[in-house]
Amino acid sequence: MKKLVYLLAVGSLAFTACNNSPAYKVSGTVEGLADGDTIYLQEYKNGDWVKLDSTTVAGGTFTFTGRQDTATNCFIIYAKDGKRNRADFFLENGNITVALGEENKIGGTANNDTYQQFKDNFIAMSKEMNDMYRSAMSDSTLTDEQRENVMKEIEKKDSIAMDMVFNTIEANITNAVGIQLLPSYAAAFELDKQKSLVEKIPAQFANNDRIVKLKKHIET
């Protein structure tokens, strides 16, 4: 009898430990899709799209659940009436919130909050510069000197934007956000700046395909 009680207790503890193991839950809302429409979870790996999971929309919402060993850049994708939406984020254990529409928003975990903040800042800066450029080019009342001054102001803002990019990468070079952003923006930095960032990459990311390619490029 005592042995049976012991075995039941051990089994209960094992079940609890299993249930408490790290997992992710992606809770999303989506605009423009009907009940039963399919949304895909995919990873872009070695030049190919790899389907990880799929789910259907119900009441404008969808959910993905599972477990993830390391934070990985993935995509939530759907197509409807010839329109395609693709939102990238970090699939990692934790509660991830997703809002898909004209402007995709993803957060809820440390990497995704940081990544979304970076995107918001970069998009806002880019929009401001584009608006300034279009306005200067379309305003027939401006003199050449005035247009030149606008272009100089845009160059200053561009420099500020790239400083923001560099600082974000540097601050996150030990996590998935920095590792994702560095290869994407490295070409915008001087070689010595690229090297300074690469030297700070932890060993756990040393074999990342994009990082390996970047290192080879820097060395040549």
Task: For each feature predicted by the language model, list its residue ranges.
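Bacterial Sec-dependent N-terminal signal peptides
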Residues: 1-29
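Amphipathic alpha-helical repeat scaffolds of TPR domains
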Residues: 130, 174-184
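Amphipathic alpha-helical coiled-coil segments
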Residues: 155-172, 192-196
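N-proximal helix/coil linker or "cap" segments that precede and/or mark the start of modular domains
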Residues: 192-220
